[in-house]
Amino acid sequence: MSNSEKNNLRRLPQRIRHELRFRQVAVAEKILVAQRFYRIVFSGDALAGFLAPGFDDHVKVFFPDATGELRLPTVTEQGIVWQDGVRPAARDYTPLDFDAERNRLTMDFYIHPGGVASDWASRAQPGDKLALGGPRGSLVVAEDYAFQLYVCDETGLPALKRRLQTVQAADIHLYLLTDAEIGQAYLGDIGGAQVTWLGSGDLPGAQDPTALITTLDTLTLPDEDYFIWLTGEGQRVKRLSDYFIGQRRRDDASVRAVAYWHQK
């Protein structure tokens, strides 16, 4: 293997495994951000040792049942065992920030109708409790790829916000399925990134990426030293992933495609 190939291998995203832990946490603070997100700070001694080094890491958030009871599982050699075999409602969320000295974890909840997490966040008050599982692992992505491309809707904005706080690339392109006013208020300073606002991902037809792909056809992609990140609705993410890997011949190791939700 040449030195160049070794260097490229070292720059590929690296997976890190974590010991699976479940934690009970309590709401410490809650504020409304950009009119569409609740930023909730959780605290608790159980957060000691929490790790989430990847910008789009996720924890499994478990919600209380209709009676208010919060269930935590037992981790055994045979796997995860839930009390009475009942698994509570759960959703994946990105850790936005973690203060290890104070054991305070911050996550942003996108507000939308009919969502168990959104409904809980809307009602949440200081002292309310949740259970968290994971992260099971992290994908650590170099911050200084020369070219970086990010496509997401509102659900991906917390991970993107975290990424933009540390990214060092000179050539960053953002294609965002969100209202420009909300996106600008939420993300704040995006430095020199070039952003294309595509309208809210909640709008009818927003999950069809045909028009976006036509736009992307005009974008020149480098052959090396790049990273592409795609998130949002499952079918749209798959079509975009197929486009970049198949039609645009990008290396699948440098294309991160993750479905954050699925249209029903």
Regions found by a protein language model. Give the residues of each.
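Extended, composition-driven regions rather than compact fold-specific motifs
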Residues: 2-264
